[in-house]
Amino acid sequence: MPKTSYLNKNFESAHYNNVRPSYPLSLVNEIMKFHKGTRKSLVDIGCGTGKATFVVEPYFKEVIGIDPSSAMLSIAEKETNERRLDKKIRFINAPGEDLSSIRPESVDMVISAEAIHWCNLERLFQQVSSILRSDGTFAFWFYIQPEFVDFPEALNVYYKYGWSKDYMGKYLNDNQREILLNYGGEKLRSLLSDRFGDIEVTIYSPSDPNASTVTAENSQFLWRAAITLNQFKEFVKSWSIYTSWARDNPSKPDIADIFINELKEICHCEDLNVPLKIEWSTFYYLCRKRE
């Protein structure tokens, strides 16, 4: 997998868990409606602190979360114990492409939330196919970026600091950029179709209706919220690319502060605690193992 500060044992996983959004039940319901198989076993690839794991686990009897970050898993395990789910959920500290500890054709569903861009896709899809039962479902999804509803020009600032190679975007490789900016991209779709069928792709982009396959009214993965610029700054600081930038530029001003100051001007918002309306660009894939 590509280098990421998430693998650092000192990564602020508790901060990550506190500021990252959860996933809507409407999305989970859509996934379960698509699923035709039994509901015994679930595997969550790149489970991190368990954001998706705990949303989907009620539908299954056995759950395995896999993540290469021991710091992330420590948070997931703590919450598992607090929820008294330690007999139902277990975690494996391994890359998403390494599913060798799971018995072939033993899993009903594999999910991955905001994670497969860290994986070798060809290897990942081969491994997922090998552990799924013949009627098994593979579902993965991403939220891409929050778009400021009343200030569409703020998206340019987001692209500048979050995606461009001049700033934090330089810590994303070309494959990751393709997945995140092109709703999966052609390479992903080609590799996926080699091993999976009945592929459904659902895209919602507030700023690009031509790319969207659904409207806001019928999207099952719709995130609308009010967020302050201070809250948004904490979200930025949860990014691995932010941590990497801060590590490599210790003598420079905090890139998150610079980012927020530009947004403050664009959004005409002197008070960083004033809520601003946002809407997320999202996409998700649903598919089944080929017979």
Swiss-Prot record:
Its EC number is 2.1.1.-. It is an enzyme of class 2 (transferase). It is found in: Cytoplasm. The keyword Methyltransferase applies. GO terms for molecular function: methyltransferase activity; mRNA binding; S-adenosylmethionine-dependent methyltransferase activity. The keyword Transferase applies. Keywords: Cytoplasm, Methyltransferase, S-adenosyl-L-methionine, Transferase. GO terms for cellular component: cytoplasm. InterPro entries: Diverse_substrate_MTase, Methyltransf_11, SAM-dependent_MTases_sf. Induction: By cell wall perturbation. Present with 4380 molecules/cell in log phase SD medium. This is Probable S-adenosylmethionine-dependent methyltransferase CRG1. It comes from Saccharomyces cerevisiae (strain ATCC 204508 / S288c) (Baker's yeast). The lineage of its organism: Eukaryota, Fungi, Dikarya, Ascomycota, Saccharomycotina. The gene is CRG1.
